[in-house]
């Protein structure tokens, strides 16, 4: 009788573990990659240090609207030095950001990039994504 009770207890424990593993996979959701792209001619730098960028998100349609967008200055190692602007994408995944470059930046060593933040949309996990870094041109 003790053997039957142990076997039953073991089966219940195994069933609970399987159910837990299945639930964890369901909660994790389906991951969707995000690629941040610039429109042609973007970003634009002017002589006074103002920079503007426009573009869109290449991702699943459910992940396009209301994504947090950050316009960042990064150094040669990819470390964020400053955040120039923040906004959200529109319903089509388009975004527009602008900001003033810090005056203390050494010429030719830094870049700007745009980052889309991570977001959950229903059963989907919209992963964070970044644009290709664009070198800040030397001041003329």
Regions found by a protein language model. Name each.
Residues 17-25:
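C-terminal segment of classical bacterial N-terminal signal peptides
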Residues 106-134, 138:
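Enriched for extracellular/lumenal, surface-exposed ectodomains of secreted and cell-surface proteins
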Residues 59-66:
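A short beta-turn/strand-edge loop motif at beta-sheet boundaries
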Residues 27-48, 139-140:
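Short, compositionally biased P/S/T/A/G/V-rich stretches that sit at domain boundaries
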């Amino acid at each position: 009788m003790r053997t039957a009770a142990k076997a039953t207890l073991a089966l219940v424990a195994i069933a609970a573990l399987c159910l837990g593993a299945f639930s964890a996979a369901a909660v994790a959701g389906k991951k969707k990659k995000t690629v941040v792209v610039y429109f042609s001619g973007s970003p634009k730098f002017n002589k006074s240090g103002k920079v503007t960028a426009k573009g869109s998100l290449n991702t699943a349609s459910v992940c396009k609207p209301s994504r947090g967008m950050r316009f960042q200055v990064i150094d040669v190692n990819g470390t964020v030095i400053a955040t120039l602007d923040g906004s959200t994408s529109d319903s089509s995944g388009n975004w527009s950001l602008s900001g003033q470059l810090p005056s203390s930046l050494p010429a030719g060593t830094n870049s700007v990039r745009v980052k889309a933040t991570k977001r959950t949309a229903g059963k989907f996990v919209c992963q964070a994504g970044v644009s290709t870094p664009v070198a800040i041109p030397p001041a003329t």
